């Protein structure tokens, strides 16, 4: 089971700005080259998380304002990520897997939206590959954790209108060939250190 960090792209407001240095968003990068910008909401009560499972695009919106747009990794066939309308009802930054296999494996920045389903840090593949949870690169997971709170609504559908308006700007990410860190690193408390720099920026 692979779980690590990543990069991202992003944009906001009336004019969408790509902040990853990739003008088209079509190039695929590995985990080491992934960096994300997320905008601080004006009204946190208006934040909503939207996930398109067919494209694996994740958008964080404040009304019509885009705060963050990144690639996620959703459930594989036979272990699909649930669709529908949910709310974040539990957050835990330093969460670890409690069952075997891989007991103790970090699931940092856990944001639970349904029983046993949540957003968390992990290796992001270009195809659905999880057991139903939604994995995000560390760069994205830390910022999602900062953007949402208990009660933040979540919408998960096979496709979303935002796929057409913002989807082309999502930087594609492929960590399927990235090596797993040593287990000693995964089990270290230092694993839960935030990525460098501010998690949210003003626009």
Language model features by range: what are they?
Residues 22, 27-29, 80-85, 92-203:
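Exported/periplasmic cell-wall-interacting domains
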Residues 12-15, 23-24:
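Intrinsic disorder/low-complexity segments in short proteins, especially the signal peptide
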Residues 52-54, 73-75, 89, 114, ...:
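A structural detector for beta-sheet-dominated domains
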Residues 1-11:
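Bacterial N-terminal signal peptides that target proteins for export
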């Amino acid at each position: 089971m692979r779980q690590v960090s990543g990069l991202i792209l992003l944009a906001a407001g009336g004019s969408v700005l790509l902040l990853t240095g990739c003008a088209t968003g079509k190039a695929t990068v590995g985990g080491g080259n992934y960096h994300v910008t997320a905008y601080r909401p004006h009204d946190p009560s208006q934040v909503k998380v939207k996930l398109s499972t067919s494209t694996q695009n994740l958008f964080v919106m404040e009304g019509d304002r885009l705060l963050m747009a990144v690639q996620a990794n959703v459930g594989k066939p036979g272990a699909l990520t649930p669709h529908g309308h949910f709310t974040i009802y539990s957050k835990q930054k330093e969460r670890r897997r409690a069952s075997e296999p891989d007991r103790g494996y970090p699931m940092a920045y856990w944001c639970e939206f349904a029983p046993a389903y949540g957003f968390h840090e992990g290796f992001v593949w270009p195809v659905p590959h999880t057991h139903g949870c939604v994995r995000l690169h560390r760069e994205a997971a830390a910022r999602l954790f900062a953007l949402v709170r208990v009660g933040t609504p979540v919408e998960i559908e096979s496709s979303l209108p935002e796929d057409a308006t913002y989807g082309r700007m999502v930087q594609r990410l492929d960590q399927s060939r990235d090596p797993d860190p040593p287990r000693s690193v995964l089990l270290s408390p230092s694993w839960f250190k935030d990525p460098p720099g501010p998690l949210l920026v003003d626009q």
